[in-house]
Amino acid sequence: FCRRDVSHQSVGAQILGLARHNKNMFTRFVENISEEKDWCTYWEINRYNKPAPADYTNDKEFWYNLNANFDVMQACLKKYQWTGDAGYLTDPLFTNFYEKSVNEYVHRWALEPEKIMDRSPYMNQPEDFNPNNNFHTCRGLPSYVENFRGLTVGVDLLATMYAGFNAYAEMAGLTGDDVKMTKGRTQAEAYREILENRWWNPDSSFYQTFWTEDQKFYRGEGVPFILWFDASENPDRIRASVKDILSREWNVENM
């Protein structure tokens, strides 16, 4: 069970009557967050709630896409909206995951709005860091794109963080915590401002998708996440992004 896939397919699962299965999977994901994994959880688990060997050796060597925590947060809000299950808002396993994700996790991986464009492609690595070991180089991928070397931020990460912080704000509002609600909305808007002010290319009428360690933009996958997470409010840019998506064939994981 993959965090990205569960997050993106859980509404369909709900429609099929699988609310109990959704709750079980999200519970397993949120309960496995830990400082030893630098506030990541497991990228994929099996039916025994164990990390999939294809993605995990130990807490210092594993595969993880940084979008995941925020994707789970927005998905959990949707599950509450579909089910009315207050556990998504108040269960200590879930609230601990939300708080660690918007605080310690963001700090540990230099994802704050003021730092995200200057972060390193490889962070929180073991002393014996091996650039040829995928469980070193992919432990904290800043995108769902997994094959672009030197990537420090993907546009999909920005969009997912926008959605995650918005979800955090809405859940805080539902539980009467106005301070956290304001914090979430403010930080979500900060990511949107970065997207609109720095990632939009007015000459070509598209969003850039990759930001790299050499401080340059490149183009590739990621634009659908801007629309999926409502990260842009600009009608002209939204229409241009739809045109951009339709202009070529994409990897299914980009859709």
What are the language-model segments listed below?
Residues 181-199:
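Short amphipathic alpha-helical coiled-coil/interface segments
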Residues 77-107:
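Internal, well-ordered domain-core segments that constitute the primary functional module
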Residues 2-34, 92, 96, 103, ...:
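Active-site core of glycosidic bond-cleaving carbohydrate-active enzymes
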Residues 43-71, 86, 106-186, 221-225:
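The feature captures the catalytic groove of carbohydrate-active enzymes
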Residues 34, 81-88, 110, 173-177, ...:
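Short, flexible helix-adjacent loops and helix caps
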Residues 28, 32, 75, 82, ...:
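Structured segments of extracytoplasmic/periplasmic soluble domains
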